[in-house]
Amino acid sequence: MKQDIQRIMLAAAKPLFLIFILYMLKIVEVGMHWDLSHLGIYPMEKRGVFGILTHPLIHSGFSHLLANTLPLFFLSWCLFYFYRGIAGKIFILIWIGAGLLTFIIGKPGWHIGASGLIYGLAFFLFFSGILRKYVPLIAISLLVTFLYGGIIWHMFPYFSPANMSWDCLLYTSPSPRD
């Protein structure tokens, strides 16, 4: 029992730390009256290259950040709990992969936010659970489908709000597999 609680807490530590960083960045950005959107991705332009690494850290406002907080925490926690041996590698691959693909084939304009990371995590958890045919991971696949199945519609421009970058969401769908 004690080991289970430790494992749960350990899996939560990295997502909580990331979310803490996201909120601290947003608080500093707002408090200092800065606009950090230039740290996002601007496809196929030199000024947007750094955004491949930083785009998930920058959000347009607290509502954008708040909308990403719970899915980012839950999906990251699932990754670090159920895939602890490969979680770090998968997380980094999804982070960089979403940024790189958005940089290469995204629409002109700044792309910011952790939504691409969230979509990549959701698709990895879904497909990895199904492909491994291991009952606990299949259960996670079904839970991810139940909680976040509707996100698939935001991958297409027709169903996405006008200010949402659907490009990054589409490119992370075929997430990296181990």
Where are these regions (language model features)?
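Hydrophobic transmembrane alpha-helices
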Residues: S76, F80, F123-S128
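Conserved small/polar residues in nucleotide/adenosyl-binding loops
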Residues: Y171-D178
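N-terminal TM1-TM2 helical hairpin plus the immediately adjacent luminal interfacial "cap"
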Residues: A11-I90, F103-H111, A162-M164
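Divalent metal-coordination and catalytic microenvironments
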Residues: L53, H64, G116, F146, ...
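Short, Lys/Arg-rich, polar N-terminal cytosolic tail immediately upstream
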Residues: M1-R7
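Membrane-embedded alpha-helical segments of multi-pass membrane proteins
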Residues: L66, L70, A114-A122, D167
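Aromatic-anchored segments of alpha-helical transmembrane domains
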Residues: Y23-K26, I96-I104, L143-H154
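Loop-to-transmembrane alpha-helix initiation sites
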Residues: L137, P161-L170
